[in-house]
From Swiss-Prot:
HAMAP family on file: RecF (MF_00365)
CDD domains reported in the protein's UniProt record: ABC_RecF
Domain of life: Bacteria
Family classification: Belongs to the RecF family.
Keywords of this entry: ATP-binding, Cytoplasm, DNA damage, DNA repair, DNA replication, DNA-binding, Nucleotide-binding, SOS response
Protein name, entry field: DNA replication and repair protein RecF
SUPFAM superfamilies from the UniProt entry: P-loop containing nucleoside triphosphate hydrolases (SSF52540)
PANTHER family the UniProt entry points to: DNA REPLICATION AND REPAIR PROTEIN RECF
Key word DNA damage present: yes
C-alpha cells in the first residue's frame, strides 16, 4: 500500500497544504522546527487517529484555530481509498470514502504504518510505558478487536481507580461496586493479555532471524513478556481469568490503601534478551539499537504476513542516529517494496541506492518551497 497524496488544514504549523507522494521513497528535508516532523506525524495520525508524540489532541490543531483536518488518498492492491480525520476540542471524527465511521476502531488498521523515530531507540532502555505503547499501537493495527478491548479496559480502569481513591476514607459501603469493576477489568484484561501473547509469539518469529542477520550470526534475540500476575502463554482464557481473580483478591486491601489498581495489563512489561542477557541492563548501546531496529523491521514483515500488503514506513530523523552498517541494513531490507518517508536536515552522508530516485520535499516554516526528483 502507499499514500499518494495528503491535504492538511490547520494542522500544527501548516495552515493549508496539498502534497503528492511517490510510491517508493520520499525524502523530506528541512532545518529543525520547520515542520518536517509535523508532516511525518500527520501521515501517522491519518493512519492511527492518534499522535506518537503527544496524547493531547489540542496540540495538533494550529494555534488560535478551532479544528484541524487531515485528508489522504491511499492506494491498496485492489482498491483506492480516501481517508479523512477531523480534530476538534470535542474529539476526533474519521471518514472512510466520505462515510463517517461510528468508532475509531473501525477506521484504524485500514492504513498501516510503522514509525521509526529517535525515541524508538529508547524502546529497550526506556520505561515500561514505552514498551506497552509499542505493543498497543502495533497490535491495534492488525487486530481491531484488541483496540476495542483496550478502550473498554481503560474506561473500567479509570472508574475503578476513582472508586479506590474514594474508598481510602471508608471502604465498607463501596465493596460491591468494586467487585463489579474488578470482574469487568478481568474480562477485558484477560483478552488483552491473550492477544499480546499471540502477537509477541509472531513478533519473536520475525525479529529473531532479523536480529541474527544484523549481528552477522553472533546474537540471538529473545522477547519475554513480563505480566504483573502469574500467567503464561500456555494458559487458556478461562485460566487467565481465574489467576486474575485470585490475584485481585490477594491485593484488594493494598489497592484500597493505595487508592489505585496494582495489577493488570497496564502494569505489564517486556524484556529483551540477547544471548540470554537482559539487553536493558547488560546490553551495549549498539546491542540496544540493533534490538530496536530488529523489532521495527519485524513489524513490517509481521504486518505484511497479516494483511498481505506492506505498511508505509516513516523514518523520522532516525537514519542519522544509526551507524553506516545498520543504516545500510535497514535501507537494503526495505528497498523496492515499502513506501518510505525519510526526514532529515541534509541528505549528505546518506549514500544509498534507495534514495537515488527519491522525491525530495523541502520544508521551510510550514510551507513546501520546492519539490524535485533526485537524479
Amino acid at each position: 500500500m502507499f499514500i499518494s497524496e495528503i491535504q492538511l488544514k490547520n494542522y500544527r504549523n501548516y495552515e493549508k497544504l496539498e502534497l503528492s507522494f511517490e510510491d517508493k521513497v520520499n525524502v523530506i528535508i528541512g532545518e529543525n522546527a520547520q515542520g518536517k516532523t509535523n508532516l511525518m506525524e500527520a501521515i501517522y495520525v491519518l493512519a492511527m487517529a492518534k499522535s506518537h508524540r503527544t496524547s493531547n489532541d489540542r496540540e495538533l490543531i494550529r494555534w488560535d484555530e478551532e479544528f484541524g483536518q487531515i485528508k489522504g488518498k491511499l492506494q491498496k492492491r485492489n482498491s483506492s481509498l480516501s481517508l479523512e480525520l477531523n480534530i476538534s476540542k470535542k474529539g476526533k471524527k474519521a471518514k472512510l470514502n466520505q462515510l463517517e465511521q461510528q468508532k475509531l476502531s473501525q477506521y484504524i488498521g485500514v492504513m498501516n504504518v510503522v514509525m521509526f523515530a529517535p525515541e524508538d531507540l529508547n524502546l529497550v532502555k526506556g520505561s515500561p510505558q514505552v514498551r506497552r505503547r509499542f505493543l498497543d499501537m502495533e497490535l491495534g493495527q492488525i487486530a481491531p478487536i484488541y483496540l476495542y478491548e483496550l478502550s473498554q479496559y481503560q474506561k473500567v480502569l479509570t472508574q475503578r481507580n476513582h472508586l479506590l481513591k474514594k474508598m481510602q476514607g471508608n471502604s465498607k459501603n463501596e465493596e460491591t461496586m468494586l467487585d463489579v469493576f474488578t470482574l469487568q477489568l478481568i474480562e477485558h484484561g484477560a483478552k488483552i493479555l491473550q492477544k499480546r501473547f499471540e502477537f509477541l509469539h509472531l513478533l519473536q518469529e520475525w525479529a529473531a532471524p532479523i536480529h541474527r542477520g544484523i549481528s552477522r550470526g553472533l546474537e540471538e534475540l529473545e522477547i519475554v513478556y513480563k505480566p504483573s500476575v502469574d500467567v503464561s502463554e500456555s494458559m487458556d482464557l478461562s485460566k487467565i481469568k481465574e489467576v486474575y481473580y485470585e490475584s485481585f483478591q490477594s491485593v484488594k486491601q493494598r489497592e484500597i490503601f493505595r487508592g489505585t489498581t496494582l495489577i493488570g495489563p497496564h502494569r505489564d512489561d517486556l524484556q529483551f534478551f540477547v544471548n540470554s542477557k537482559n539487553v536493558q541492563v547488560f546490553g551495549s548501546q549498539g546491542q540496544q539499537r540493533t534490538t530496536a531496529l530488529s523489532l521495527k523491521l519485524a513489524e513490517i514483515e509481521l504486518i505484511y504476513s497479516e494483511v498481505k500488503e506492506y505498511p508505509i514506513l516513516l523514518l523520522d530523523d532516525v537514519l542519522s542516529e544509526l551507524d553506516d552498517y545498520r543504516q545500510s541494513h535497514l535501507l537494503n531490507t526495505i528497498q523496492g517494496k515499502v513506501q518510505t518517508f525519510v526526514t532529515t536536515t541534509s541528505v549528505d552522508g546518506i549514500e544509498h541506492e534507495t534514495l537515488k530516485d527519491a522525491k525530495t520535499i523541502h520544508v521551510t516554516n510550514g510551507t513546501v518551497d520546492c519539490e524535485i526528483d533526485r537524479a
